[in-house]
């Protein structure tokens, strides 16, 4: 058996697994330690722990759709995670700028899928605010997804391989 000359980036799935584990551990802590819908200040005037639930997607999109949306979001997350895993298998290991965001999105997506299967909703608990302006509550899986999406966006903007060529 010959070794591939350029190992793929599937090793980055270890980061996805770590994100899933940390996400589920924090949510287990939230479910056993925080009261529902009561702010617990972390940094007064900016950050609370706030246990809440989201049956929808980002910003509670489709949260009142009647239940079918859970299966849509599970299918989307699994499909996107599968596609990104395939892309990781085609990405050389040394290309961390691509592999890192893919791994973040996979870990965050699967973390929220686990919530939907176990609870029928996603557990959120991080609440940021300034004065009376509150950002929607979120969790570590959401943070990983957003960081990964930002990474992909930055890569597409600044990576020389994807930049238009000048004559």
Curated annotation (Swiss-Prot):
Superkingdom per UniProt: Bacteria
Pathway given in the UniProt record: Protein modification; lipoprotein biosynthesis (signal peptide cleavage)
Active-site residues per Swiss-Prot or TrEMBL entry: 124, 142
PROSITE patterns: SPASE_II (PS00855)
An example molecular function term from Gene Ontology annotations: aspartic-type endopeptidase activity
EC identifiers of the protein: 3.4.23.36
Keywords, sorted A to Z: Aspartyl protease, Cell inner membrane, Cell membrane, Hydrolase, Membrane, Protease, Transmembrane, Transmembrane helix
Transmembrane parts of this sequence: 10-30, 68-88, 98-118, 138-158
Entry keyword Glycoprotein: no
InterPro entries in the record: Peptidase_A8
HAMAP family: LspA
Protein name (Swiss-Prot/TrEMBL): Lipoprotein signal peptidase
Organism this protein belongs to: Xylella fastidiosa (strain 9a5c)
Protein's gene: lspA
């Amino acid at each position: 058996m010959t070794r591939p000359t350029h190992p793929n980036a599937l090793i980055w799935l270890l980061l996805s697994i770590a994100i899933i584990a940390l996400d589920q551990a924090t949510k287990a802590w939230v479910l056993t330690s925080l009261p529902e819908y009561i702010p617990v200040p972390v940094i007064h005037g900016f950050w609370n722990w706030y246990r809440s639930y989201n049956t929808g997607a980002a910003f509670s999109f489709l949260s009142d759709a009647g239940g079918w949306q859970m299966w849509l979001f599970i299918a989307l997350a699994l499909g996107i995670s599968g596609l990104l895993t395939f892309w990781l298998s085609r990405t050389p290991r040394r290309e961390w700028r691509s592999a890192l965001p893919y791994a973040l999105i996979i870990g965050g997506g699967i973390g929220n899928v686990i919530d939907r299967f176990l609870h029928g909703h996603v557990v959120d608990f991080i609440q940021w605010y300034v004065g009376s302006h509150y950002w929607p509550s979120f969790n570590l899986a959401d943070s990983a997804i957003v960081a990964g999406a930002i990474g992909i966006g930055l890569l597409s903007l600044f990576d020389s391989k994807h930049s238009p060529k000048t004559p």
